[in-house]
Structures are given as C-alpha cells and as structure tokens.
Amino acid sequence: MLNKVQIAVVDDDKIFQLITNKTLHTIEQVGTVWQFYNGEEALIYLQEHAGEPDQLPDILLLDINMPVVDGWTFLKDYLGLHDQLRKDISIHMVSSSIDPKDIERAKSTPMVQEYIIKPITKDKILDVIRQKAEKA
C-alpha cells in the first residue's frame, strides 16, 4: 500500500480513544487519525468534507453505545450520506458488547465490514488495514 491509511475512531470512551490513538500512531501504514466522541460529531465532519476524499477516512472504527448519536443511529444517518461521499469508507464496529443481538445486527448490516469486541489490538488493526488494502 503506497498511501497511508486514514482512520476515524468514533467512541465516547476517552481511555479507549487514547490507547487506540497511541496504537495507531505506532503503525507505519497509518496516516491521519481523527477522533470523534459521538456519532453526531463524525456525521457532521463527513458531511462537511463529503466532496474532499483526502479529508475522509479510509477506515472508520465505530462504537455502539455513545451519547448524542449512538452507533446504530450513525449507521442509519450514514446511509443517507453515503452517496455524497467521494470515498468508500470501510466501517468496523468496535464495542465492548458481547450481546449476540448486537453482533448479529452488525453482521446483518451490509455497510459494516466486521464486529470487533474491545479491546482492539495492534494485530487486529493491521488485519483491518490489510482487508481495506485488498479491496482497493
């Protein structure tokens, strides 16, 4: 992969954000990392930069349970925004929920590539990056 992968992390857990951000910055293939603390912040950013592929993430790591706009609502709203985006964003749900209903719901949502149970490891992030590179 020649270009560095841009990643957005959408999660209200500040400790998860801190650890994930530090981990992402140890990976050579990772370029820009955006941090959003709820789905609304991420949706606003995506809307504002819909026509600017360089300002959009390649991969979006999305939590389920967040204030303001949760992961499920984000996905519903993202569906309406998707056609405006000038980049194909790979969405991976990352949650501490082991509820089979959440896992099944994520797996049955076409735009969700994968359901990852926290904590997310460096190896898992590298796997997500490889998956994205294979689709490019």
Which residues make up each language-model segment?
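Conserved acidic segment of CheY-like receiver
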Residues: 5-15, 20-24
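Helix N-cap/capping motif at the beta->alpha junctions
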Residues: 35-45, 71
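Short amphipathic alpha-helix used as the core "switch/output" element in two-component signaling
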Residues: 44, 72-85
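Two-component signal transduction core modules
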Residues: 60, 114-115
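Active-site residues of response regulator receiver
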Residues: 63
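Receiver (REC) domain active-site loop signature in two-component systems and cognate sites
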Residues: 66
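Alpha4 helix (beta4-alpha4-beta5 surface) of REC/receiver domains from two-component response regulators
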Residues: 73, 87-92, 98-114
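A Lys-centered signature of the CheY-like receiver
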Residues: 118
